[in-house]
A protein has these predicted regions:
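Cytosolic, long alpha-helical scaffolding segments
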Residues: 1-212
């Protein structure tokens, strides 16, 4: 019985890795849509659907583990954490769709002034990758490392926000463009928040304590 349970847990880990890779890919596409002005909405929609399908598949695996097996406390933490993590990964996909909607109508020549948004995207990708690896490897230090990127993302957002406020004061006609860029930065910040949530659920799965 335990061997079967461990096999299902291994499958759960594999599915989480795949879903995490989808999130990394879709965040990369969001950044490209901002900087290159080329938005492949079909590809992004397809990945978004794959993320949704992965969420349902992982939910099903978790429910079977809970109902058909007899998980001990640490197993329950791992399963419940996985359920929380996939919710945040799905929301990352939703934030990307918001970014792409704004980037579609944005002149990409202005994007060169906001390379910090690219750094925000890179940081969120790193957070997701580290968090999923930490979950699979039960590596508490790796989960803590992932959380460190949240402050970096917040700092970049503050820099961008202050810069845009200054631009609006100097040139009120640029207000609409500035607001779109600010919202894109805000969506990346929210992706960072979801990635932080993932790391915190990894910590919970290992220690039984959340949000420390």
């Amino acid at each position: 019985m335990r061997n079967r349970f461990d096999t299902q847990l291994e499958l759960l880990n594999k599915k989480l890795v795949i879903m995490g890779e989808m999130c990394e890919k879709i965040i990369t596409l969001a950044a490209e849509s901002f900087f290159q002005g080329k938005v492949d909405k079909n590809t992004i929609s397809e990945i978004g659907k794959e993320i949704d399908d992965s969420e349902k598949e992982i939910e099903s695996i978790c429910m079977k583990l809970l109902l058909q097996q007899q998980p001990v406390a640490k197993d329950l933490r791992q399963i419940s954490s996985a359920l929380k993590m996939i919710t945040d990964m799905k929301r990352i996909g939703n934030q990307v769709e918001n970014i792409v909607d704004l980037a579609t109508n944005l002149d990409s020549t202005y994007a060169e002034n906001y390379l910090s948004i690219g750094r925000m995207a890179e940081s969120t990708i790193r957070m997701v990758k580290l968090s999923i690896q930490a979950f699979v490897n039960k590596d508490l230090e790796m989960a803590k490392e992932a959380k460190l990127y949240d402050d970096i993302i917040d700092d970049f957002f503050c820099l961008i926000k202050n810069d845009l406020i200054s631009i609006i004061h100097q040139n009120p006609d640029s207000g609409e463009y500035a607001i779109d860029v600010l919202m894109i930065a805000k969506y990346f910040e929210r992706i960072g928040d979801h990635a932080t949530n993932i790391a915190e659920w990894v910590e919970f799965s290992i220690t039984g304590m959340h949000g420390e």
